[in-house]
Amino acid sequence: FLGDAPTGVLLGGPRAVRSDEWGTLTPLCFRQQYNTLGAYNRYSQTIGLVRTDNMLVYGQPAWDILTLFRPFYWGYLFFGSERGLSWFWCARLLVLFLSWFELGMLISDGQKKLSVMLGICVSWAPFIQWWFAINGLVEMLIYGAFFVLGTNYLVSHAFNPRKIAVAVGMAVCAVGYVLTFYPTWMVPVAWGFVPLFLWVVIWKFDRKVLRRVDVVPWLLIFVITAAGLTVLALTSWDVIKAELNSVYPGNAPSSSGGTGLWWMMKYPISLVSRFSMNELIVENSSIICFAPAGFILALWVIIKEKKKDPLLILLLGINLFLAWYYCVGIPKWLAKMLLLSFVNSNRGPQVLGFLRLTLFVRAVALKEKAPKRWLAALAAVISSAVPMRLALGFTKYEPGGLRYEYFDTAEKFVVVWAILAVVFYLLYRARKSKYTMAVLGVCTVVLASSIWINPVAKGVPEITKSETMQQIRDLVKEDPQAIWLVVDM
């Protein structure tokens, strides 16, 4: 961070490329403890002399009623910056895995192995790990998953005191989702949860146990959510208008049509990113979703096994619609009506890997028959060639024309293709309650592609114990009213 103290890293290595984490978000959160307007004040002029609102853009911990809807910032308020940073990282990873494990239990009808696989595929996806602390993506996935799970509980259980607690939690999720305030990811992530929400509300609704009193939790959700959003609008309206009228992300170029297919199917790049550490690997990371295996498995279940499963059909439908939107396009008026006009050509396809994961988990959970070995092998080789071809042709250009090739040798290409073909084969041969090898293969590929990304560190000695920081402390003691000008740091 400052370069003159131990980093405290126990495993892995610091990621200088993630400057919007260590150079922006973390310093902004740490400054709150030393806010000149009061520790963890909602407003600050500690960095810069202009009084700024800390709630939305790069939202920071603050003693404010809206922080009730940001539980992952509570560690800063109660334990200070160093332990607060640990709470922020560790709690989010743990809760992300648990929320998607529980969502997997719902999607797979209680099959634990598939649920563990889904939790690992989401929480340890390379794309999630590279963007773990920035722009609220992890929170979006957590809040969306818990909202679906909460809805399932409310529509399938008789009224009891737990429903009130669930309703409060769902309201926290709803307002917390809005507080992430990054439209170019908020919109596609929300659309990814739509089929799950519809399935729960329509097909899991149990009229036998529900009574009029069961409307109370929904009213509570509405009241708390409305109150939270009203407070946000009244106190941050200028920030909201400025964000929505910004060049990015407020007015991001629409992704209707264009290069969506490349962004949706380039996940093989993440399997070799360990050996290609250029500054664009973060932008080009993916959720390893093993597409198009999910589509093929879904069609097998629907056509070959003649199962008209509502959730599988909903997931397949929204996948195809969003693929059409990104690759072909829809009219501008429809894109605006569906809020998809906020989504640009790379951010949207990047996050929808989790939607394709839910598709293939549901398909494997329902699949009872397996194709013959030779047919599964042939299908695996051919279908895995699709993402490999797209990844091979995916090239990122900078304004200066600098070109990056991720599969710069034939060996890399062949090895990754072979790995994907094996996993695809295991998925095609998998069937209900007989998919252990497929689960192990999927988890191994995902973890090998991502577990090295974020280092494990103890404390933040590079900030708190560096010579530079000690000199700054001494100077501040000499002249607490000094105005600082920092150059080339």
Task: Outline where the language-model segments fall.
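Membrane-helix boundary/interfacial segments in multi-pass membrane proteins
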Residues: 83, 87, 127-139, 320-375, ...
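Aromatic-rich transmembrane-lumenal/periplasmic boundary elements in polytopic membrane proteins
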Residues: 1-53, 213-271, 483-485
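Membrane-interfacial entry segments at the cytosolic side of transmembrane helices
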Residues: 161-165, 205-223, 307-311, 369-378, ...
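Transmembrane helical bundles and short interhelical boundary loops of multi-pass, membrane-embedded
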Residues: 372-488
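Soluble catalytic regions of membrane-associated enzymes that act on cell-envelope
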Residues: 21-63, 70-73, 79, 435-489
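Membrane-embedded helix bundles of polyisoprenyl
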Residues: 97-106, 112-205, 214-237, 383-390, ...
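Periplasmic/ER-lumenal interhelical loops and adjacent helix-loop junctions
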Residues: 230-311, 346, 350
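Transmembrane alpha-helical segments
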Residues: 96-104, 144-155, 194-199, 203, ...
